[in-house]
Amino acid sequence: RIRCGAKIDNMVHIAHNCDVGEDVIIAAQTGLSGSTRVGRGAILMGQVGSAGHLRVGEGAFVGTRAGLHRDVPDGVRVWGSPQMEERAWHRSVAALSRLPGLLRRLRAVEKRLGLRRSRSEAEKEETE
């Protein structure tokens, strides 16, 4: 069911038994799995994907390319795949850019402490 005022962009898939509330905005290339309910005034940005039988709350915001695997409460902003609240997502994205430097520092500390393993030892340990 698609209710009054809903705006749906191109290449959006709305599966069986979905309920899209009033004044919802769904951007391009979004897919709603079966029995997903989207509350009034929610916004789903482009390339969002949802697992089935979920509820996106009223006034919720789902950022671009988010992968929904659980309900989104009313008024909450989520991003990412898997979904996380906006503040946590921003912190995660910022941390990713710092990983190469942190790995270099960790290797230097390991070397200084004599904890450095060879690559073959690490690979062997991972397969056990």
Language model feature labels by segment:
Residues 1-85:
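Structural signal for interior beta-strand "rungs" in well-ordered beta-sheet cores
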Residues 84-127:
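Long, leucine- and charge-enriched amphipathic alpha-helices
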